[in-house]
């Protein structure tokens, strides 16, 4: 679970970096204005913004695919954890637990895991007190 949180934080950081826009200096804007013979500074900013859009689209595509891969792997890990917990908690065979988990929706599996780990965390906290 810790690795999932770290991976999620890394993906969020990369998305923020990809969507951040570098600061534009007056010198860069003047060059764009001279190249395109623009009289208005706002037009130069607009053209520079259009030039940056293609890079942002490529970055979004990369991070979107990465996010889908991470989400798929986390779903598989949740399924395996739910099966292990059912086997341990209910004392049933692995096949029976797998059948129960397969019948559950992703939302039900998440709730089951949150409930289990919530109780476990509460027990640890009460032991420390």
UniProtKB/Swiss-Prot annotation:
Protein name in the entry: M-zodatoxin-Lt8e
Keyword Signal: yes
Signal peptide: 1-20
UniProt comment concerning the protein's domains: Both the N-terminus (61-94) and the C-terminus (99-129) of the mature peptide form alpha-helices which probably disrupt target cell membranes. The linker region (95-98) probably derives from a processing quadruplet motif (PQM), found in propeptides of many zodatoxins, hinting at a fusion of two originally separate membrane-active peptides.
Gene behind the chain: cit 1-5
Sorted UniProt keywords: Antibiotic, Antimicrobial, Cytolysis, Hemolysis, Secreted, Signal, Toxin
Function: Insecticidal, cytolytic and antimicrobial peptide. Forms voltage-dependent, ion-permeable channels in membranes. At high concentration causes cell membrane lysis.
PTM remark: Cleavage of the propeptide depends on the processing quadruplet motif (XXXR, with at least one of X being E).
Chain residues in the propeptide: 21-60
A Pfam family this chain is assigned to: Latarcin
Gene Ontology biological process terms from the UniProt entry: defense response to Gram-negative bacterium; defense response to Gram-positive bacterium; killing of cells of another organism
Membership in a protein family: Belongs to the cationic peptide 06 (cytoinsectotoxin) family.
Main subcellular location: secreted
Tissue specificity annotation: Expressed by the venom gland.
Sequence motif Processing quadruplet motif, location on chain: 57-60
GO MF annotation: an example: toxin activity
Gene Ontology CC annotations of this record: extracellular region
InterPro entries per the UniProt record, alphabetical: Latarcin_precursor
Organism: Lachesana tarabaevi
Localization per Swiss-Prot or TrEMBL: Secreted
